[in-house]
Amino acid sequence: QWDPKSPWHDRRVRLAAYYAIDRRSLNEAENLGASRLTRAVVPRKFEFALPLEPYPYDPAKANQLLTEAGYPNGFDAGDFYPYPPYFSMGEAVATNLAAVGIRTKILTMERGAFQKAWLSKKLKGVCFCVHAPYGNAASRMAEFVPIEGSFARGADPDIEALYRQQARETDRKKREAMLHQIQQL
């Protein structure tokens, strides 16, 4: 999303991907329905989490958003890397994306090779990643929001500044408000 020439730079394309993924079916198939669906990287049960409802599975809405963004026939999104060993879940996500025209090529890797390539920020394309640290909203965002985060591939300067500001804030209510603001962006 950080490359202005990439289709992912357009928020409508990113939203289309959200609407294209059938999370309930994935949850049933992969976890026997035991996982709680979430909308963002911060689970609703975490301290300072903004209780956002997950986007519904709506391929028609995904197609509409892609058309509005200028991709009525979809686009080639490049390589798709499922986090080892979640290959079957990655394949299901890639299939959901392909159904609305977001075409990828699945590349699987051994976990050690994946981790090395990912942490050195050498993987390009789409990554289906699994990340489950404990803590609160801030600790969950630590790997995604600041540029040095292991899952970050770019950073919005305003969001990153707000993230750093909340880390220094000692007033709990102000900190919570800042973390909620980040989750809404």
Positions of predicted regions on the chain:
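Sec/Tat-exported extracytoplasmic proteins
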Residues: 4, 21-25, 30-34, 66-73, ...
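Structural transition elements
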Residues: 4-11, 19, 36-68, 86-88
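Extracytoplasmic/peripheral linker and loop segments enriched in polar/acidic and small residues
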Residues: 15, 27, 99-114, 119, ...
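Solvent-exposed loop/turn segments at secondary-structure junctions
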Residues: 23-26, 34-37, 46-48, 84-87, ...
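Short, solvent-exposed loop/turn and secondary-structure capping segments
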Residues: 28-32, 40-41, 90-92, 137-140
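Short, well-ordered beta-strand elements
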Residues: 74-83
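Short, polar/charged alpha-helical segment
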Residues: 88-100
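Paired acidic/hydrophobic, glycine-rich loop segments that form the ligand-binding mouth/hinge
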Residues: 124-130
